[in-house]
Amino acid sequence: VAAAWKSLLVLEDVEHALVMGVAGTLASATAADQADFLIFVPFDMTLKRLKASVKVAPSSSTTFQIRRSTDSGGTFSNAFGTVVISSSAKVGVADPADLNVDEGDLLNFSITVGGGSGENAAIHVLGVQR
């Protein structure tokens, strides 16, 4: 019986969400490293998708760029792609090319052209363990 169940078992990658955010009004111009708290990558992962949400919609399209540090937060560089929340919208979704990250890497994000509007953003980085 156990062998029969094993043959029916389908293994799928389980997605994990790493979430970071910033409280208050979004930046009015390009502003790097905006996360209120840096996010540790908990294990070796392949990042797959991005989602962003805001409590108050921005008056102009706002781009969030994921940034990564491999040196304990000493420096951050753009990584993994961007997600855009369009003018007057509250959510954005993106499917950039996959990126492998390592346990202990730190994630942050930059904001471009927030128009000084929109409030309280959450950035969701979705990935699978590798």
PLM feature segments, named:
Residues 1-30, 55-57, 61-63, 67, ...:
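Glycine-rich, low-complexity segments
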Residues 109-116:
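Short beta-strand-plus-loop segments that form exposed binding edges in beta-rich domains
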Residues 45, 103-105:
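Surface-exposed loop/turn positions
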Residues 116-122:
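Extracellular carbohydrate recognition
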Residues 90-103:
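Short, surface-exposed tryptophan/glycine-enriched loops
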Residues 45-56:
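A short beta-strand element within beta-rich, extracytoplasmic domains
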Residues 28-43:
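Short beta-strands within extracellular/lumenal beta-sheet-rich domains
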